[in-house]
Regions:
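Basic helix-extension-helix modules of the SAP/HeH family
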Residues: 1-57
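N-terminal "pre-motor" subdomain/linker immediately upstream of P-loop NTPase catalytic cores
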Residues: 38, 43-137
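Flexible glycine-/small-residue-rich
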Residues: 49-51, 68-70, 79-81, 93, ...
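Phosphate-interacting basic helix/loop segments used at nucleotide- and nucleic-acid interfaces
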Residues: 59-62, 164-168, 253-258, 307
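A structural connector/turn signal
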Residues: 94-96, 170, 245
C-alpha cells in the first residue's frame, strides 16, 4: 500500500503505466476508485487512472486539439469541434517547445480552473500527446519528410447486400489507403447519402482507421443528421459562419490528420465540399489582381490544393485518405472552374449522374466515368480481367446502369457477382 500511496511520488505517467501488467493497473484503478475498470481496454484504463488521479489532487484531466498562435508562441487546446470556445485550455510556449508540439496534436493533461482574472483553463502538466508518451513526440518525422507512394492496400467498403453504392465503388472505383478521391456531384444526386454510407463502411470494416468527416459551408440540419448517423469525428463550419472560420477549421483538421499520420496511423477525411472551401479562400485571400472566369482569383487555389494534395500513402507506415466532393451543374460558373482546376489532381474519381437521379435510379453513379488510377495495385488479377470485360460492354444509356445494378442486387456479395460473371463468360465462350 505504501508503494501505491502516491502516484506523484512514483512518477505515474503514461509510459510507466503502459509498461505495467493489467494486474498492477487494476491495483491503481482500485486505489483511485475507477469504476468498471475491468471492462476497459488497457489504453482506456490508463487514461481513466490519470483522470482519477488528477481529480483526487483537485485538478481536471482534459484534452483538446492544439492550435498554436504563431505570432505569440503560446497556444490553446480546443476540446470542442476544433473551434474556439469557453472551455479552451491555455498551453504555455515553454511546454510547446519542450515537447516539440505542433498544430493539430491532441494533448491530454492535468488542468487547473481559471483564476478570478483569467478567461481560460491552464494546462499544468502534459500527460499524453496523440495518446502516446509525450517524450516520443519529439522523435517524430515531419509530415513533408515522409515518402508518398501509390495506394496499395485496398479499403474494403462492402458491408451488406442492401448498400449497393459502396459495392459499386469497390468494383469500379476502388479506394485504397492513401487515395486522393474526388466525388463529382450535381445537386440532388444523393451525395450526402453516399458520404454517410462510405463513413459507416469505414467504421464497420476498418475500426482502426481514424475517420474525420469535415463539413464546410453546409446546412446545420445536415450536420446534425451526419453526427447522429456516423461513428467518427464530425467537424463542421456551417454556412452561417464567416469564411475565415471555414478556413480555420479545415486547416486544423488537416494538421490533426498529418499529426496522426506521423504516428503511423491510417486517417480518412471525408469532406463536403472542396468547392465551398475554395470559395471561402477566394473571399479571404488578398486579391492578386488576376481573375479567372466566374470571378475566382487564381491565387485562391493554392491552399485548397495543399489540403487535397496532402492525401498520400506513406512508405514508412500510415496513410492519409481524402475523399472530397466537388459540386458541378449548380448554375455557377465559379463552381465549374473550381472543378476543372481539381480534375487532374486526384487519383480516383466517382461521378454522380443527374439523369439517373431524375429517373430515381439510386445510387446515381455514372459507372462509365468513375474509376481509379493504378487500380491493378488494389484489385486481384482475376477480378481485374472481368472488370475490364464489364467496362468494354458498357454503354451510356441509363437502361444499362439499371440492368447492371439489378444484377448486383441479385447477388449477396461482390465475390458472388464475380463468380456469376465468370460462369456467364464461360457459357458465351462455349457457344
Amino acid at each position: 500500500l505504501k508503494i501505491l500511496k502516491s502516484g506523484v511520488e512514483m512518477g505515474l505517467n503514461i509510459s510507466s503505466l503502459e509498461n505495467m501488467k493489467l494486474k498492477e493497473l487494476y491495483e491503481h484503478a482500485r486505489e483511485y476508485k475507477v469504476s468498471y475498470y475491468s471492462k476497459l481496454s488497457k489504453k482506456e484504463l490508463i487514461f481513466a487512472i490519470l483522470k482519477a488521479r488528477a481529480e483526487q489532487e483537485g485538478y481536471f484531466f482534459m484534452e483538446g486539439v492544439l492550435e498554436i498562435i504563431q505570432s505569440e508562441g503560446f497556444g490553446f487546446l480546443r476540446p470542442i469541434n476544433y473551434s474556439p470556445s469557453s472551455e479552451d485550455i491555455y498551453i504555455s510556449a515553454s511546454q510547446i517547445r519542450r515537447f516539440d508540439l505542433r498544430n493539430g496534436d491532441k494533448v491530454s493533461g492535468k488542468v487547473r480552473p481559471p483564476k478570478e482574472n483569467e478567461r481560460y483553463f491552464g494546462l499544468l502538466q502534459v500527460e499524453a500527446v496523440n495518446g502516446d508518451d509525450p517524450e516520443s513526440a519529439k522523435e517524430r518525422v515531419h509530415f513533408p519528410g515522409l515518402t508518398p507512394l501509390y495506394p496499395d492496400r485496398h479499403m474494403n467498403l462492402e458491408t451488406s447486400t442492401k448498400h449497393i453504392s459502396t459495392r459499386i465503388m469497390d468494383l469500379l472505383a476502388p479506394v485504397g489507403f492513401g487515395q486522393r478521391g474526388l466525388i463529382v456531384a450535381p445537386p440532388k444526386a444523393g451525395k450526402t447519402m453516399l458520404l454517410k454510407e462510405i463513413a459507416n463502411s469505414i467504421t464497420t470494416n476498418h475500426p482502426d482507421a481514424e475517420l474525420i468527416v469535415l463539413l464546410i459551408d453546409e446546412r446545420p440540419e445536415e450536420v446534425t443528421d451526419i453526427e447522429r448517423s456516423v461513428a467518427g469525428d464530425v467537424v463542421s463550419s456551417t454556412f452561417d459562419e464567416v469564411p475565415e472560420n471555414h478556413i480555420k477549421v479545415a486547416e486544423l483538421v488537416l494538421e490533426r490528420a498529418m499529426r496522426l499520420v506521423e504516428h503511423k496511423r491510417d486517417v480518412v477525411i471525408l469532406m463536403d465540399s472542396i468547392t465551398r472551401l475554395a470559395r471561402a479562400y477566394n473571399l479571404v485571400i488578398p486579391p492578386s489582381g488576376r481573375t479567372l472566369s466566374g470571378g475566382i482569383d487564381p491565387a485562391a487555389f493554392h491552399r485548397p490544393k495543399r489540403f487535397f494534395g496532402a492525401a498520400r500513402n506513406i512508405e514508412e507506415g500510415g496513410s492519409l485518405t481524402i475523399l472530397a466532393t466537388a459540386l458541378v451543374d449548380t448554375g455557377s460558373r465559379m463552381d465549374d472552374v473550381i472543378y476543372e482546376e481539381f480534375k487532374g489532381t486526384g487519383n480516383m474519381e466517382l461521378h454522380l449522374d443527374r439523369q439517373l437521379a431524375e429517373r430515381r435510379i439510386f445510387p446515381a453513379i455514372d459507372i462509365r466515368r468513375s474509376g481509379t488510377r493504378k487500380e491493378e495495385l488494389l484489385i486481384p488479377k482475376d477480378h481485374l480481367d472481368k472488370l475490364w470485360a464489364i467496362r468494354k460492354s458498357m454503354t451510356d444509356s441509363p437502361d444499362f446502369v439499371e440492368k447492371f445494378m439489378r444484377k448486383l442486387k441479385q447477388t449477396k456479395s461482390n465475390e458472388e457477382f464475380f463468380a456469376n460473371l465468370a460462369e456467364e463468360m464461360k457459357a458465351k465462350r462455349s457457344h
